[in-house]
Amino acid sequence: APSVAKIRYNPGHLHHHEKSLPWQEKVKRIAHWAAEGDTALRIGVNCGSVDPAQKQLWPPEDSVSPMVASALEHSALLDEIGFIRYTVSLKDSDPALVIEANRNFASTRPEIPLHLGVTEAGLPPDGVIKTRIAFEQLISQGIGDTVRVSLTVPNEEKYQEIQAGREILDDIASGRVRSVVQYQTDGPNIISCPSC
C-alpha cells in the first residue's frame, strides 16, 4: 500500500475472516503489510461491530467497556510487535457514549492519538448536533487529534461534512461552545449510514 497513508481495520470484523487464525496473527499480518508499505494504521472500533469475545466479558447494557477493552488490547499488541504508527477511534451513534469511550481510553493511554467521530450520525442538522456535542466535550479537554463528521447526504453533497467539521473546530477554537443546548434524548433517534 505505498500510495495509501493510513488504513483502518475494525477489530470486530477480524473474527469473521479466516476463523481458524487467532486475531493476533491477523493483526500481525496487517501490521507487517503496513510497515512494508510505510502505511499507518487506525484501530477503528465501532459500536455496531465490537469484538464478540470482548462483548461476552461485559453486561449487555455496557457497550462502552468492550469497545475500550478491544482498543486497549489491539494497541498493546501493536506496541508489543514494535508497530508505532497507529491511531485509535472509538465510535458510536450516541454522542454521550462517544464521549465516555474516548475519555476512558485517553485516561489509560493518553499518548495514543485519537480519531474522533460519531458514526451513523444521520441527517443534518441532527447529525451535526450529535457530532458537535461529542467534539466540544472531548476537544475542550484535550482529547482528540483528528476528526470526521459523518452525515447522511448524497455523494455530491459530502462537502457538508467538511464544512460542518471546520465550523465545529472553529467554534471550539474561538470559545463558542454550543453543547450546553440540550439535545433531545426522549424522542426518536435516527441512525443512518453516511453513504446509504
Where does each model-flagged region fall?
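Non-cysteine beta-strand/loop elements that form the S-adenosyl-L-methionine
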Residues: A5-G12, A40-C47, L114-L116
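Catalytic alpha/beta core domains of metabolic enzymes, predominantly
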Residues: A31, N46, K55-C196
